[in-house]
Design a protein with these regions (language model features):
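Short beta-strand->loop
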Residues: 28-38, 123-136
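A late-sequence structural motif
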Residues: 127-170
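Central regulatory/effector-binding core of bacterial HTH transcription factors
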Residues: 1-24, 93
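A ligand-binding cleft/hinge motif common to bilobed small-molecule-binding domains
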Residues: 18-25, 74, 78, 97-126
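Hydrophobic residues within well-ordered alpha-helices
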Residues: 7-8, 58, 101-107, 142
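Short beta-strand-to-loop elements that line the ligand-binding cleft
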Residues: 18, 86-95, 130
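Secondary-structure junction motif
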Residues: 47-48, 62-83, 150-154, 158, ...
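Flexible hinge/capping segments at coil-to-helix
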Residues: 26-64
């Protein structure tokens, strides 16, 4: 929400954010890349390994989530509501990169993009909790305000991002 507000006020020429996102009518978005989030737990919760869990079954365990002012929180709030549950985190992290260390410390279960957890997963510090419910895919998006002309640096940066995405998606 902060990046979108800054774009709407003309404080920035573009922003790179994750979905879901509520955009103003003049803003346009370009999908840059999809990503998948996973639910992870630390060694204190090893007893949760080895089977698929329903979200409802996991509500008894502490949950670490981003703050309620973030779109990630809104995403998980909607995910829980769509499964007839209420999102009730026990700990709110300020940034996504804080979730893995909090999970490793045994403070609870946490949702993170898969690539954020890869090192901790490889080291055996955390593991993926298999869910019965499917977490929807999210996207990294470039957002620009169609009502404003971006400066040269912003245009070049957007061109580079789009070019990089095109090359990654080439056969």
């Amino acid at each position: 929400p902060q990046a979108i507000r800054a774009l709407g006020r003309g404080l920035v020429d573009l922003c790179v954010i994750t979905t879901p996102a509520r955009l103003e009518s003049t803003m346009r978005r370009t999908l840059l890349m999809p990503f998948q989030e996973i639910l992870i737990a630390g060694r204190d919760f090893e007893f949760l390994q080895g089977r698929r869990w329903a979200l409802k079954e996991l509500q008894q365990y502490p949950l670490i989530c981003l703050g309620s002012e973030t779109m990630t929180y809104a995403f998980y709030n909607q995910f829980y509501l769509s499964n007839n549950l209420v999102l009730q985190p026990d700990t709110e992290a300020a940034t996504t990169d804080q979730v893995v260390p909090l999970v490793k410390s045994g403070l609870g279960l946490g949702y993170v993009p898969q690539n954020f957890a890869k090192d901790a997963l490889a080291a055996g510090d955390v593991f993926t909790i298999q869910l019965k419910e499917e977490i929807p895919t999210r996207h990294v998006v470039l957002v620009q305000d169609g009502g404003r002309v971006p400066n040269a640096a912003a245009r070049e940066f957007a061109r580079m991002l789009n070019s990089s995405v095109t090359q990654q998606n080439a056969p």
